[in-house]
Amino acid sequence: MKGFDPKFKDFPDYIISITKEIWEGREISSLHKYYDKDIIVRSPSSVVVGNQQVIDATISTLAEFPDRTLYGEDVIWCGDPEKGMLSSHRIHSTVTHTKKGIYGAPTGRKLNYRIIADCHAKNNKVDDEWLIRDQGAILKQLDLDPKEFARELISKEGGPENCVKPYTYENEIKGPYIGTGNDNDWGQLYSDILTRIMSADFSVIPKEYDRAVNLEYAGGISDISYKGADNFWMGLRSSFPSAEFKICHQIGRLDEKMPPRAAVRWILNGKHDGWGTFGEPTGASVFILGASHSEFGPHGLRREYCLFD
């Protein structure tokens, strides 16, 4: 890979290896080597600019969860070393809640949750990122109410006027990566499926999904088959019936020894104006940054992962 350290055999190896080196190897200072000093990191809760803030956040997380592991389940990617590459990295993380921190007093509980990180890299450095951590899964396992947790966090940060602002179109910062993925058929198929679902065509689920599809969804939800997919997507869409659904990025891949896969990053922007997963409509403005991965087999979409915060 031109411009990258020769110790990495390919781009997925680069992404998985530096993640392990930084977090499990405790080489947090290597972020200076692998992350651009002006990196932009967008997550549902904030937009962060600068590598020093990334380093500070990494130290804070490891202080609360010293035994954190990050298992790279998949890296779905596009691009080339000369122009830059974009990876969608799905991680299964395990931790033990042994130290006091953002989640309160230590409980000793062992937690499992997923992250999807879309990273743009060129010349051995990551310079643009979209990061989604399944906070709902963490809170559920700690018996914390997500709504109360969010309210308390806002209060600690000085109230609605002074707290860290969540990511929206208003505080978007244009970074080095302006691509929208690749034109692989599998990425296009998955984008079409999600677009049809968000256009209220839920009949696409039994048409395109394998009856035995395995489902891993935001909030630590594990489910199976058509009903599980229908419950999740119906509950989300019915909560925000008038919200605009936008595909921001799509990648499809067909690699040796791997099934066809796709990664899609999307935004749902509008009002909480319907009954669904989030209860009684409040009319609140809502901006959801989501990431979805899928795997296809002989009978259709057979594995689906979808995260938002």
Q: How would you label these PLM feature ranges?
A:
Residues 1-309:
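C-terminal and inter-domain tail/linker signature
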